[in-house]
Amino acid sequence: MATERTLAILKPDCVRKEKVGEVLRRIQDAGFQLCAMKMITMSKAEAEGFYAVHEDKPFFDDLTDFMSSGPCVPVVLEKENAIADFRELIGATDPDEAAEGTIRSDFAGSIQENIVHGSDSPSNGQKEAGYFFPEHEIVANT
């Protein structure tokens, strides 16, 4: 099976709750390689650009307000079957529906403030990683 790339964003609620280290430890313990990482505060326009796929949805403004409300940590991850494995690790978008022991079940407070973003497909993983990191900043693990 080929190595896949996915993008995680440890959201502003993760940073506010001081859970960044614990979430990263869980990600690494699950076998993911960290290939790029930085702490940023997205502008409203940057959040709108990243989440443009949702611009027609009723939650778009609240989502982009939240994502630009404070620091977040985008992280490029690689692993075989990265997309599916990461989505399993983080759990359902709604923490009340997330399986016990998942990151969202353990740390998230709501559907919006759900600790972490994860890419939903290999093509989106590549595209989303490129939104935050030029290719020369991504250190592929061999």
UniProtKB/Swiss-Prot annotation:
| Active site per UniProt | 117
Catalytic reaction(s) noted: a 2'-deoxyribonucleoside 5'-diphosphate + ATP = a 2'-deoxyribonucleoside 5'-triphosphate + ADP; a ribonucleoside 5'-diphosphate + ATP = a ribonucleoside 5'-triphosphate + ADP
| Class of enzymatic activity (EC top level) | transferase
Q: Which UniProt key words apply to this protein?
A: ATP-binding, Cytoplasm, Kinase, Magnesium, Metal-binding, Nucleotide metabolism, Nucleotide-binding, Phosphoprotein, Transferase
Where located? Cytoplasm
Note the superkingdom of the native organism: Bacteria
Q: Which GO terms describe its cellular component?
A: cytoplasm
* Primary localization: cytoplasm
Complex formation: Homotetramer.
HAMAP family membership: NDP_kinase
Which family, according to UniProt? Belongs to the NDK family.
> In its UniProt entry, what is this protein called?
Nucleoside diphosphate kinase
Q: Where does this protein come from, organism-wise? A: Salinibacter ruber (strain DSM 13855 / M31)
